[in-house]
């Protein structure tokens, strides 16, 4: 297994999946969950301390390989942002490996994002390789309005800077997602699912949450005063919601 991972605590396995960051994204939540569970946090391929790939990247199959390597037959997945997208795809393709599913402001394969979102992403990409400018543009998005004025701003900037440096190292590979996309299969989710999102997150991410509300049996919880980085700014709230859900 060449992916970087950390394991803390004992009990039922809980696997944490991040998006555009690294295991530091879970610093506060992981420490709380490790009181009661075996917590596995890992860096996706090409991020954090995990190696890049010379071939197309399939995060779903990477997760399967990690679970097999750790001899985890069944786990609860907690995914943030794109990590939530990966967790959803995994739950649809390997339902027997999932006990419960927790999604924090998740992405969704096949979802049509707004023109405004696409234009913002284009501006960020056009600013490359000026990492400071890319970070400035990204954090100017309203979905980061809470974390940027919190004590966790510096951690956020550090993770983004490291992530973007890693991105420039990637060879020309693409991400492989299962087909058909999850948006067409949400009704097939069998794992009991909790979706948590900050009320100050972006309109697009709130639309994703609403899509889950309409097309799956997921329980939706909106947290007041939280943005896209609810895992950094509201770890105690997440801990209470997640542990309550897992005890059901």
Label every model-predicted segment:
Residues 112-114, 131-187:
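Conserved alpha/beta-hydrolase catalytic His-Asp/Glu region
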């Amino acid at each position: 297994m060449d992916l970087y991972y950390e394991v803390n605590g004992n009990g039922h396995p809980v696997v944490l999946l991040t998006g555009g960051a690294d295991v530091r994204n879970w610093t506060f939540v992981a420490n709380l969950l490790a009181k009661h569970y075996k917590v596995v946090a890992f860096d996706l391929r090409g991020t954090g301390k995990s190696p890049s790939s010379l071939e197309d990247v399939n995060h779903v199959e990477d997760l399967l390989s990690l679970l097999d390597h750790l001899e985890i037959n069944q786990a609860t997945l907690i995914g943030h942002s794109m990590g939530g997208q990966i967790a959803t795809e995994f739950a649809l393709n390997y339902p027997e490996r999932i006990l419960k599913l927790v999604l924090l402001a998740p992405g969704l394969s096949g979802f049509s994002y707004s023109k405004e979102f696409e234009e913002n992403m284009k501006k960020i990409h056009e600013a490359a390789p000026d990492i400071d400018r890319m970070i400035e543009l990204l954090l100017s998005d309203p979905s980061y309005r809470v974390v940027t004025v919190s004590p966790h701003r510096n951690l956020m900037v550090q993770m983004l800077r490291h992530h973007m440096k890693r991105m420039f190292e990637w060879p020309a590979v693409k991400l492989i997602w299962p087909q058909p996309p999850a948006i067409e299969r949400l009704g097939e989710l069998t794992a009991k699912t909790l979706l948590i999102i900050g009320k100050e997150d972006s309109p697009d991410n709130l639309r994703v949450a609403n899509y889950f509300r309409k097309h799956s049996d997921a329980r939706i919880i909106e947290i007041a005063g939280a943005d896209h980085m609810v895992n950094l700014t509201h770890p105690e709230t997440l801990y209470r919601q997640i542990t309550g859900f897992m005890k059901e």
